[in-house]
């Protein structure tokens, strides 16, 4: 009993001094953007709450639901909440098939809600609330085998006898559950193919980047051949981004058209009707490149960066990296011609060739890999909030890729975890997260009194703000890997420092000076604590010795 008690006392002391909590706010520095983070854990029935938390991880508001949450949430300027929840009434096989949008007031009362989902169609993934209160939303519709063949699809590429058409609907909410369709765009009005010359849409794919090749894609066996997963709108340009994950590209269409013009190739500010006015990521889809020309790999959350951020007007992309096993968050400047209200294209692949900014793990690019879900947001101070969706890790980086704030969602399918639990052994997914500044008008007149943190049995105070000096040593020393059966690397430009290794009982096992490589192969499997000391400053890292 005495030995167990000592372990918990040591662990608690080590944790509180050296920030070894596993859940909630893991890092909180004075360089982070002051605000509130909105997110919905993507769990089954264990927890159906959308949370608004401060930088300390304390809840300032939450909204419950009777439906499982999807995690596409927006806090409106009036303090109300739009969110997507799962009420799929269709038989479409689409991961991310949500079906329902809810609009709630600050106190959780329903203002309006719509399930737009039936046997052969469904709202899915993403939507945008416009300034006039209308909603743009992604909708998938079933197309039959015959309809697919009539549009030139190669039957050899159809393992199932249907395809899904991606559409964008603009609806006007009416009453508490009604709507009017205001505008509509359907992707199958803009197809081309070079497989069947008996069809009306037969043509040279490479000569028509404004059209979508019905035989392009990387998942020919699936009905969900586009798998659109993000929608973004620029009110300044009156344009819409659609991210097509399975094509490894995103496209931009003109929203200034009428519905009739959106079905054709003329009209609108661009003069191109509903045709594609810009595309980026994979020129293979329009026969203008090969695999080496690909820029995007199963991307998510492609968005116009809004006014108020340093890179406003540019485009941010969460480039998941499926197929290359590392993830990047990138910002690009598309070749937009403001005079002609269109994008410059002179043949070949659409530019740009290079990105303006990107984040990837600064120590080892393969340390950061989120193969699905996920998103990012540029904040007004230039920092970027990143949501690593598969593991529910939210972290904020500055323009130099230093992590200045991080938060691990404690909500798993099994329930709310306790601090000290290993989230890697649970499913703690989050699709996206957004951060709102303290001065956001949606907070005017609202009670933002901090409540408890979400995690059970917290061992740390997430409001213990790291000073710039304390953060300096965090940034100046990189330790990797933290799970190993042999070597630990210490990367730093510091000349003098002490390295100490402790077991879970607080026993000092090793002490050395200014080394950059430790061999722990002789130690038993289990958990250890590595402490690095420089001029009175301390960095601590939890190490797992594997078999």
PLM features: residue spans?
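Sec-dependent N-terminal signal peptides
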Residues: 4-14
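Histidine-/acidic-rich catalytic cores in large beta-rich domains
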Residues: 20-466
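Positively charged n-region of N-terminal signal peptides that target proteins for export
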Residues: 1-4, 545
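Generic extreme N-terminus detector
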Residues: 4-5, 423-426, 513
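C-terminal outer-membrane/trafficking sorting elements
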Residues: 15, 54-55, 469-547
């Amino acid at each position: 009993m005495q030995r167990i008690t000592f372990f918990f006392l040591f662990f608690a002391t080590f944790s509180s001094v050296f920030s070894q909590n596993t859940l909630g706010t893991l890092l909180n520095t004075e360089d982070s953007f002051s605000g509130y983070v909105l997110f919905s854990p993507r769990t089954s029935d264990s927890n159906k709450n959308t949370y608004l938390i401060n930088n300390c991880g304390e809840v300032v508001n939450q909204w419950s639901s009777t439906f499982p949450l999807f995690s596409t949430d927006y806090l409106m300027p009036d303090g109300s909440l739009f969110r997507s929840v799962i009420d799929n009434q269709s038989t479409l096989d689409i991961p991310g098939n949500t079906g329902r949008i809810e609009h709630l007031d600050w106190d959780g009362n329903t203002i309006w809600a719509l399930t737009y989902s039936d046997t052969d169609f469904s709202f899915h993934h993403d939507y945008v609330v416009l300034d006039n209160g209308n909603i743009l939303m992604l909708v998938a519709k079933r197309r039959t085998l015959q309809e697919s063949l009539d549009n030139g699809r190669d039957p050899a590429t159809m393992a199932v006898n249907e395809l899904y058409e991606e559409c964008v609907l603009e609806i006007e909410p009416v009453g508490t559950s009604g709507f009017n369709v205001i505008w509509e765009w359907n992707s199958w009005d803009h197809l081309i193919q070079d497989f069947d010359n008996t069809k009306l849409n037969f043509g040279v794919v490479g000569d028509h980047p404004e059209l979508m090749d019905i035989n392009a894609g990387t998942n020919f066996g699936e009905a969900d051949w586009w798998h659109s997963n993000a929608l973004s709108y620029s009110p300044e340009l009156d344009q819409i981004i659609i991210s097509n994950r399975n094509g490894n590209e995103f496209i931009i269409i003109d929203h200034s058209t009428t519905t009739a013009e959106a079905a054709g190739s003329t009209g609108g500010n661009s003069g191109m009707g509903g045709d594609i006015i810009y595309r980026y990521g994979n020129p293979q889809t329009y026969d203008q490149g090969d695999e080496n020309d690909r820029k995007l790999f199963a991307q998510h959350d492609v968005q116009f960066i809004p006014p108020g951020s340093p890179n406003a007007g540019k485009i941010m992309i969460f480039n998941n990296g499926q197929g290359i096993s590392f993830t990047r968050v990138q910002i690009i400047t598309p070749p937009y011609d403001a005079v002609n209200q269109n994008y410059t294209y002179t043949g070949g692949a659409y530019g740009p060739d290079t990105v303006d900014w990107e984040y990837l793990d600064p120590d080892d690019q393969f340390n950061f890999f989120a193969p699905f879900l996920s998103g990012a947001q540029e904040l007004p101070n230039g920092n970027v909030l990143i949501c690593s969706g598969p593991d529910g890790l939210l972290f904020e980086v500055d323009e130099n890729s230093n992590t200045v704030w991080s938060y691990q969602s404690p909500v798993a399918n099994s329930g709310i975890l306790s601090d000290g639990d290993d989230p890697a052994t649970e499913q703690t997914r989050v699709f996206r997260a957004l951060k709102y500044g303290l001065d956001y008008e949606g907070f005017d007149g609202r009670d933002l009194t901090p409540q408890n943190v979400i995690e059970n049995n917290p061992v740390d105070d997430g409001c213990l703000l790291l000073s710039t000096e304390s953060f300096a040593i965090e940034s100046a020393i990189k330790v990797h890997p933290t799970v190993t059966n042999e070597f630990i690397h210490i990367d730093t430009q510091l000349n003098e420092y002490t390295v100490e290794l402790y077991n879970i009982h607080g026993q000092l096992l090793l002490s050395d000076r200014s080394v950059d490589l430790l061999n722990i192969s002789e130690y038993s499997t289990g958990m250890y604590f590595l402490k690095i000391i420089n001029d009175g400053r301390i960095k601590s890292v939890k190490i797992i010795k594997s078999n």
